[in-house]
Design a protein with these regions (language model features):
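Structural and coupling elements of P-loop NTPases
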Residues: 1-181
Length: 181
């Protein structure tokens, strides 16, 4: 019941609006399968077997694997890889997703949480997710220099998955500083 209450299908909520980046005009997005594709990425997971898995919701239109898209938030072209529908921790490969569907894709290299994806010929920027600034920071270091690369790789993956997590290297103290919620 909570999912239905807090995450209703786009088909049962009022149309949403976005901004056309070139003209800054407001555009209304109807939740219709016949309109051009528009979706938003809401989660990124690093999978040890398939790599990055980007979860997204389709607000209008439909999308198939191999479709050329525009990441409007970043201004970069992307190619939709295989599309899967997640059922618990199992993946069900599907041909296409339509307005109202939630799915995931492998192969979106430059897409992160909150990014808007559209067809290249109809760019539209939906309201992005606003994340709070980190509230705590701590210095970390590996047990040995040999583990530095593993630590760095792990921190990069964690930062991709969690937009509230940040990492930086402090030149003065020669320490890695991680910040988060």
């Amino acid at each position: 019941d909570a999912i239905v209450d807090f995450l209703p299908s786009p088909k049962v909520i009022p149309a949403i609006s976005g901004v056309a980046p070139r003209s800054v005009d407001e555009v209304v997005v109807a939740h219709n399968e016949d309109d051009p594709f528009c979706g938003i990425a809401f989660k990124v997971v690093s999978d040890p077997y398939t790599g990055r898995l980007v979860y997204f919701r389709v607000y209008s239109g439909k999308v198939t694997g191999g479709t050329s898209l525009l990441n409007v938030t970043k201004g970069r072209k992307e190619r939709m890889g295989r599309i899967v529908r997640m059922v618990a921790n199992k993946r069900e490969e599907v041909e296409e997703l339509k307005a109202g569907d939630i799915g995931a894709s492998v192969g979106l290299k430059d897409t992160f949480t909150g990014d808007t994806l559209t067809l290249e010929n109809r760019p539209l920027l939906l309201e992005t997710i606003k994340f709070p600034e980190p509230v705590i920071s701590v210095a970390i270091e590996p047990k040995s220099k040999a583990e530095q690369e593993k630590l760095t790789d792990g921190l990069i993956k964690l930062a991709e998955e969690d937009p509230t997590f940040q990492t930086k290297y402090d030149e003065e103290t020669a320490q890695t500083i991680v910040s988060g919620m």
